């Protein structure tokens, strides 16, 4: 009987403790994410955008939103036109979470007051739809989580105009395979003793393509593999957004954590969007960039491997893949 009483007392204490859980988000200005915001101005509308990291989201919302696969995207819009504009949150993510949906997904058991505060806080900090003439508004769109990089489209509409801004954010905290190259001039890294040839005509480009290897190889070049069937001509700031916009994800660097996670998904199924992929070789090195697009299962995914070629076309970089 005495043990039973102890159990009841402990249970009541636990319920009391959980019921006293307070909602204590860090003030937004103290989190520091706005320092990373990027800005664009077009047709009288200025947009500032930043994608919060897992740590910033936890501080700003007192909850591990990334664990719930929710990623807050902060947006500030300044309307310097003479007409009211309308912001469309689904331009950021067609499947974005409504503020009260986020509060419901992150609610705490036996913490009614804290949950009410969450609902109010998430709603008050969401991005307004209306952008009055001559004013600035800001807030969050609660998007689905993306790691490594995110393409953000911000669209606003008025009676006489439609304005859109495109941003590409590399999100800190994710180690992608291409991070192994470091910073600096990639041509000097990949071709330190080779002159980069600039192709001036389509004929020169066609001839160069015909001279390229037909397939990838293994590390020592003794076996061939997948065909090389793609040539991309474009600046990185144009190519990278195009792939993110089309649903391609960066690939995690090969490491113990990513390998274990891949194994778990391989056994139990499900889609691991960032699974590391094997190395294939062109120009004597493994892929410079690896991207992938997964289906509903890790066993069904498309891989894209790209190598920076030792040529340019009228000064524009060339990638082969």
What residue spans do the PLM features occupy?
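C-terminal motif of bacterial Sec signal peptides marking the signal peptidase cleavage site
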Residues: 17-19
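Surface-exposed edge beta-strand/loop patches
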Residues: 21, 28, 34, 95, ...
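Low-complexity, acidic Ser/Thr/Pro/Gly-rich terminal tails and inter-domain linkers that flank the onset
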Residues: 27-67, 209-210
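Short, solvent-exposed beta-strand/turn "edge" segments of beta-rich domains on protein surfaces
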Residues: 57-74, 81-84, 130-132, 220-221
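The feature marks short-to-medium sequence segments in extracytoplasmic or secretory-pathway proteins
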Residues: 80-132, 137
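Short, hydrophobic/aromatic beta-strand segments
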Residues: 83-91, 152-154, 240-244
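Terminal, regulation- and interaction-focused segments at domain boundaries
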Residues: 212-242
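A cross-kingdom signal targeting lumenal/periplasmic-facing segments of multi-pass membrane
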Residues: 254-321
């Amino acid at each position: 009987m005495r043990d039973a009483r102890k159990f009841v007392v402990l249970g009541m204490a636990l319920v009391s403790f959980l019921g006293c859980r307070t909602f204590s988000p860090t003030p937004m200005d103290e989190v520091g994410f706005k320092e990373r915001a990027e800005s664009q101005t077009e047709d009288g509308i200025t947009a500032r955008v930043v994608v919060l990291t897992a740590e910033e989201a936890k501080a700003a919302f007192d909850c591990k939103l990334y664990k719930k696969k929710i990623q807050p995207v902060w947006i500030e819009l300044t309307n310097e036109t003479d007409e009211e504009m309308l912001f469309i949150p689904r331009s950021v993510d067609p499947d974005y979470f409504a503020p009260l949906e986020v509060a419901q997904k992150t609610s705490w058991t036996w913490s009614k007051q804290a949950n009410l505060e969450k609902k109010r806080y998430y709603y008050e900090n969401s991005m307004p739809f209306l952008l009055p003439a001559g004013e600035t508004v800001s807030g969050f769109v609660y998007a689905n989580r993306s790691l490594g990089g995110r393409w953000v489209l911000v669209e606003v509409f008025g009676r006489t105009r439609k304005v859109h801004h495109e941003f590409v954010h590399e999100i800190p905290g994710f180690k992608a395979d291409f991070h192994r190259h470091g910073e600096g001039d990639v041509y000097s890294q990949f071709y330190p003793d080779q002159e980069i040839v600039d192709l001036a005509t389509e004929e020169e480009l066609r001839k160069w393509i015909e001279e390229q290897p037909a397939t990838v190889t293994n590390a020592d070049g003794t076996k061939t593999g997948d065909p090389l069937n793609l040539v991309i001509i474009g600046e990185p700031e144009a190519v990278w957004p195009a792939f993110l916009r089309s649903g391609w994800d960066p690939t995690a660097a090969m490491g113990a954590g990513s390998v274990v996670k891949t194994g778990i998904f391989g056994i139990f199924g499900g889609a691991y969007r960032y699974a590391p992929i094997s190395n294939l070789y062109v120009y004597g090195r493994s892929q410079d960039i690896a991207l992938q697009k997964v289906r509903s299962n890790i066993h069904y995914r498309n891989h894209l491997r790209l190598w920076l070629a030792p040529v340019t076309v009228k000064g524009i970089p060339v990638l082969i893949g």
